[in-house]
Amino acid sequence: MGTTIHEETSAAQPPLNFTDGAASKVKELIEEEDNQALKLRVFVSGGGCSGFQYGFTFDEIVNEDDFVMEKQGVKLLVDSMSFQYLVGAEIDYQESAQGAQFVIKNPSAASTCGCGSSFSV
């Protein structure tokens, strides 16, 4: 299994900031699905208008190379390739007049797209 960080008890600054809002929303969605084995997987893939794009999915499997972060009893998974692009990023959940969505604020992104899910390094 991969590296696990329990954000509530970790004294050092974690490599990712999984916000309370995001953790609460993930917990709510898992409860709606009635499947406590689900974890939120965040990944980076090639594509989008700026070269890379973020993706979110639910997964039951923790891969050997996954970075695992736990907050409020829910787990966030990031594969090793995606992790290098997400170090220092904040994973949040926001609601606005345009809708509600998970968002990533990434200080490593040289530029981002108006869609909010695409970036370049």
UniProtKB/Swiss-Prot annotation:
One of its GO terms (biological process) is iron-sulfur cluster assembly. Pfam families: Fe-S_biosyn. Iron-sulfur cluster binds at residues 49, 113, 115. Binds 1 iron-sulfur cluster per subunit. SUPFAM superfamilies: HesB-like domain. Keywords: Iron, Iron-sulfur, Metal-binding. GO terms for molecular function: 2 iron, 2 sulfur cluster binding; 4 iron, 4 sulfur cluster binding; iron ion binding. Its cofactor is iron-sulfur cluster. Required for insertion of 4Fe-4S clusters. Homodimer. Belongs to the HesB/IscA family. This is Putative iron-sulfur cluster insertion protein ErpA. It comes from Nitrosomonas europaea (strain ATCC 19718 / CIP 103999 / KCTC 2705 / NBRC 14298). The gene is erpA.
